[in-house]
Regions:
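Oxyanion-binding and handling regions
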Residues: 1-23, 32-34, 91-223
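Residues at secondary-structure transition points
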Residues: 30-38, 69, 73, 77, ...
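Short, well-ordered amphipathic alpha-helical segments that serve as non-catalytic structural scaffolds
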Residues: 35-50, 96
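Short amphipathic alpha-helical face segments that pack within enzyme cores
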Residues: 38-41, 77, 81, 98, ...
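Phosphate/pyrophosphate-binding loops at sites that engage ATP/ADP/AMP, CoA/4′-phosphopantetheine
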Residues: 43-59, 152-159
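DPxDG-like acidic metal-binding loop motif
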Residues: 59-95
Length: 223
């Protein structure tokens, strides 16, 4: 049996989850940009609800980006601090994959094209397919593109288009299969619960960093 703490702060909303064996507990903010205000309180609330001690957490699942710079730094700092203090490892996962996983848990889509606002005229994009256990499997590497390049990525073959924090920009697509959704800890927890089926493995806290993508210089910071 495994106890997993999930920290999802890659969007404007703070979303924290805890899996105690097969029981799932979630704390999700409805206020934007309140990561610093809520993250520790959310974790404490989840530990109380689940009747777990911090020391009983087996590992921490972390959404590492791409996404909100401030949110990613906050989530990563907290995850690293807890992991160091508890001598636990971290499972770093793409925030685009977490978003796709959240959709697969709520909708019957088989294939997704993810679009997420990156600011500075850039968008983050990714493609995912539903596999065994409803897991989101990436079809391409996460990328940052210019908004003007979006038409090169979206085609009539895309079964579903998912957007996060870019609703007004994507409204012009007028696609019947356009869904608007944000990252949620339940998607992160679902992926983490199938750790053995993922291509990403547990890492020591000093090996985990936020992932930033830029369409301007294609810079990616990962270790």
């Amino acid at each position: 049996m495994t106890n997993i703490l999930a920290i999802e702060t890659s969007s404007v909303y703070c979303s924290i989850g805890l899996a105690k064996n097969k029981e799932i507990y979630i704390e999700h903010s409805q206020e934007e940009n309140t990561h610093g205000k809520n993250i520790f309180g959310f974790i404490d609330n989840l530990l109380k609800k689940s009747q777990l001690e911090k020391e009983e957490i087996d590992f921490i699942a972390l959404s590492v980006g791409p996404g909100s710079f401030t949110g990613l730094r906050a989530g990563c700092s907290v995850a690293q601090g807890l992991a160091f203090g508890l001598q636990k490892k971290i499972l770093p996962l793409s925030s685009l994959r977490v978003l796709a996983q959240t959709v697969f848990l709520e909708h019957k889509a088989k294939e997704l094209f993810i679009v997420k606002e990156a600011h500075m005229n850039d968008l983050y994009v990714g493609k995912f397919i539903r596999k065994n256990n409803d897991l989101a499997l990436p079809l391409i590497k996460d990328a940052a593109i210019k908004k003007t390049e979006l038409s090169d990525f979206i085609s009539s073959d895309n079964k579903e288009v998912i957007c996060s924090n870019c609703h007004e920009f994507l409204d012009y697509l007028i696609k019947p299969n356009l869904l608007k959704i944000n990252n949620h800890a339940k998607g992160l927890l679902h992926l983490a619960c199938y750790l053995n089926d993922l291509d990403t493995k547990l890492k020591n806290p000093e090996e985990v960093y936020p992932t930033y993508l830029s369409g301007t210089d294609q810079w990616k910071r990962t270790k």
